[in-house]
Amino acid sequence: SCSRKGPKFVEYKYMAGSAQYCEHKNMKFMIGSNFIDFDDCTRCTCYNHGLQCCGIGANAGVFGVPGCEAVNDHCELVFLKKNTDQLCFIN
């Protein structure tokens, strides 16, 4: 799933007008920039219309595998046999 936040503006000090940017966790990003937030497992892009962040890996969407449970392993979705530490699938 994705979330969106509107753009932010800051007035220029010496020129007329304002600069537009996006803000995420108290950090400012230029329009056109993108980044991955591994704490939230999201990929974010700063557009003119604001910041869009979409889930990746473990937060990309929910689906089930019979007999297994999904576990978040640093934004990678891993399926373990229920009540064990054994992988359901080995690549």
From Swiss-Prot:
GO cellular component terms listed in the entry, alphabetical order: extracellular region
Compartment(s): Secreted
Keyword Secreted recorded: yes
Keyword Disulfide bond: yes
Official protein name in the record: Beta-microseminoprotein
Coiled coil: none
Primary location: secreted
Tissue: Expressed in ciliated epithelium of nidamental gland and in secretory-like cells in accessory nidamental gland (at protein level). Expressed in ovary, nidamental gland and accessory nidamental gland.
Key words of the record: Behavior, Disulfide bond, Pheromone, Secreted
Similarity comment: family membership: Belongs to the beta-microseminoprotein family.
Paired cysteines (S-S): 2-54, 22-46, 41-75, 44-53, 68-88
Organism superkingdom: Eukaryota
Summary of the function given for this chain in its UniProt record: Acts as a pheromone. Triggers aggressive behaviors in males such as fin beating, lunging and grabbing. These behaviors form part of the competition for fertile females.
Molecular function GO labels: pheromone activity
Originating organism: Doryteuthis pealeii (Longfin inshore squid)
